[in-house]
Amino acid sequence: MLSPKRTKFRKQQRGRMRGNANSGNKISFGQYALQALEPSWITSRQIEAARRAMTRYIRRGGKIWIRVFPDKPVTMRAAETRMGSGKGAPEYWVAVVKPGRIMFELGGVVEEIAREAMRLASFKLPIKTRFIVREED
């Protein structure tokens, strides 16, 4: 699963997800992409599950690019712990995804295979997504 090797600080505040993605919203590497339509936190487990679903479907052909990285720690307190005594320990990592963000890219396969692979990956994610094709310049 994806996680940072090291960070400047162990814990982070939750923050807010306002507006649309203003970076990472164009196709950069592949021919096809999966674009987020809703704001959400995507966990490293969800990213890995989506990657596996796509890899299994396309088998040996094609290349997958993962365009989101879980760099935000989410802390949790132990179960049945009383209030107070500080913030919990980091439990898992999430990527903050805003609407318009390209999450996965795919190249080297025909469109039907890419569309189905992205559809299978989208079932592993907690948000609505859409399949987009790179416009030829």
UniProtKB/Swiss-Prot annotation:
What's a BP term from Gene Ontology annotated to this protein?
translation
Residue ranges for the region (Disordered) are 1-24
Give one Pfam family, short name only. Ribosomal_L16
Which Gene Ontology molecular-function terms are recorded? rRNA binding; structural constituent of ribosome; tRNA binding
Q: What's a GO cellular component annotated to this UniProt protein?
A: cytosolic large ribosomal subunit
Return the Basic residues bias intervals.
1-17
UniProt keywords, alphabetically: Ribonucleoprotein, Ribosomal protein, RNA-binding, rRNA-binding, tRNA-binding
InterPro entries in UniProt: Ribosomal_uL16, Ribosomal_uL16_bact-type, Ribosomal_uL16_CS, Ribosomal_uL16_dom, Ribosomal_uL16_sf
Q: Which HAMAP family match?
A: Ribosomal_uL16
Please give the family membership noted in the entry: Belongs to the universal ribosomal protein uL16 family.
What does the function comment of this entry state? Answer: Binds 23S rRNA and is also seen to make contacts with the A and possibly P site tRNAs.
Assembly, per entry: Part of the 50S ribosomal subunit.
Protein name, as recorded = Large ribosomal subunit protein uL16
Q: Which gene encodes it?
A: rplP
